[in-house]
């Protein structure tokens, strides 16, 4: 992966696969599917694709417009910790917080906010999907 310096990169989970070269018996595969369903990753590899990139200064400017403090704090976690995960437990809060920016036709952040809300909607539709944001210095 080649990332430019000074940006936040958002990846989204698009598929998972089992890392195994052995043929799995049917009864064993049912155990594996059950394990996945309850959240255990038994040799499963997540395949992430870049959803969008945002220069650091633009990211900070974008988040400065988010009025919901808890949502802003969640999103700024990437600046503090270098990485955040956004999953189904965050979608309602973040969608509410970014909706005013997505609805503001005069905002330079409208397109990015709409794109972000679409990614959140994908998580609502398929809770196994998640976003990962990472600060690339």
From Swiss-Prot:
What Enzyme Commission number(s) appear in the record?
A: 1.-.-.-
One function term, GO molecular function aspect: oxidoreductase activity
- InterPro entries, per this entry? Formate_DH_maturation_HycH
- Write the record's keywords in alphabetical order, separated by commas: Oxidoreductase
Job description of the protein: Possible component of hydrogenase 4.
Protein's name according to its UniProt entry: Hydrogenase-4 component J
Oxidoreductase among keywords: yes
Q: Could you say which protein family the record assigns here?
A: To E.coli HycH.
NCBIfam families the UniProt entry points to: PRK15084.1
């Amino acid at each position: 992966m080649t990332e430019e310096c000074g940006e936040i990169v958002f990846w989204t989970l698009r598929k998972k696969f089992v890392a195994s070269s052995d043929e799995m018996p049917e009864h064993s595969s049912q155990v594996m599917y059950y394990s996945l369903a309850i959240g255990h990753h038994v040799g499963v590899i997540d395949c992430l694709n870049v959803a969008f990139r945002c220069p650091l200064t633009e990211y900070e400017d974008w988040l400065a417009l988010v009025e919901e403090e808890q949502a802003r704090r969640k999103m700024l976690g990437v600046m503090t910790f270098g990485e955040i995960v956004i999953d189904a437990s965050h979608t309602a809060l973040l969608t509410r917080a970014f909706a005013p920016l997505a609805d503001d036709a005069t905002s330079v952040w409208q397109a990015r906010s709409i794109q972000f809300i679409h990614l959140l909607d994908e998580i609502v539709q398929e809770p196994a999907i998640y976003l990962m944001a990472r600060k690339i210095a």
